[in-house]
């Protein structure tokens, strides 16, 4: 069992039960899944860019990403419907906890001038969205092999009913929010 999962069961659950006064363990908010999306705009001209992005996501998450395709044609971007323009991974279960642990304890502190993640990035339904400007914050990525610095969106989906509950859950996990 991963470190964060154990922490959730032994420390976070009792703390949340007492703070929000839940009657049942089933009411507890928990992390459902983590979706990591990488948009590769230059895949339109250069198809190798997408392969590099897919490989990087595979290295970071330990799971093969799905290639996302354009839903609509946009002439201004020279984009046709069905063209591959990105990659995404949905992590659940053990891999999800491993990734979250790695993100909180190793990757986020490696961001330059890091002062904590925004408190305002909750969506009102208890999900948290985080933008990462470069893939180099992950220790698995080799700096010399990177052709282009790419960012990604990381969405942490929780079963919490409100932003307050989700914020408390992530704070208990050790997510470094801004003061």
UniProtKB/Swiss-Prot annotation:
Residues annotated as transmembrane: none
UniProt keyword NAD, yes or no: no
Keywords: Ribonucleoprotein, Ribosomal protein, RNA-binding, rRNA-binding, tRNA-binding
Keyword rRNA-binding: yes
GO biological process, one term: translation
Any Pfam family: Ribosomal_L5
SUPFAM superfamilies: RL5-like
Single GO MF annotation: structural constituent of ribosome
GO cellular component: ribonucleoprotein complex; ribosome
Superkingdom of the organism of origin: Bacteria
Subunit record text: Part of the 50S ribosomal subunit; part of the 5S rRNA/L5/L18/L25 subcomplex. Contacts the 5S rRNA and the P site tRNA. Forms a bridge to the 30S subunit in the 70S ribosome.
Family label: Belongs to the universal ribosomal protein uL5 family.
Protein role: This is one of the proteins that bind and probably mediate the attachment of the 5S RNA into the large ribosomal subunit, where it forms part of the central protuberance. In the 70S ribosome it contacts protein S13 of the 30S subunit (bridge B1b), connecting the 2 subunits; this bridge is implicated in subunit movement. Contacts the P site tRNA; the 5S rRNA and some of its associated proteins might help stabilize positioning of ribosome-bound tRNAs.
Name listed for the protein in its UniProt record: Large ribosomal subunit protein uL5
Species of the source: Lysinibacillus sphaericus (strain C3-41)
Lineage of the species this protein comes from: Bacteria, Bacillati, Bacillota, Bacilli, Bacillales
């Amino acid at each position: 069992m991963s470190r964060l999962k154990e922490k959730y069961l032994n420390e976070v659950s009792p703390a949340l039960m007492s703070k929000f006064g839940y009657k049942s363990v089933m009411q507890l908010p928990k992390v459902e899944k983590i979706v990591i999306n990488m948009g590769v705009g230059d895949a339109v001209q250069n198809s190798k860019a997408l392969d590099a992005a897919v490989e990087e996501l595979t290295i970071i998450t330990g799971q093969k990403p799905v290639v996302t395709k354009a839903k609509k044609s946009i002439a201004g971007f020279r984009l046709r419907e069905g063209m591959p323009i990105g990659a995404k991974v949905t992590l659940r279960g053990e891999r999800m906890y491993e990734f979250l642990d790695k993100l909180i304890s190793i990757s986020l502190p490696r961001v330059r001038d890091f002062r904590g993640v925004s408190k305002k990035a909750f969506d009102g339904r208890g999900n948290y969205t985080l933008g990462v400007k470069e893939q180099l914050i992950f220790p698995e990525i080799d700096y010399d092999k990177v052709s282009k610095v790419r960012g990604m969106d990381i969405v942490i989906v929780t079963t919490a009913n409100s932003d307050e509950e989700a914020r408390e859950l992530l704070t208990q996990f050790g997510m470094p929010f801004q003061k």
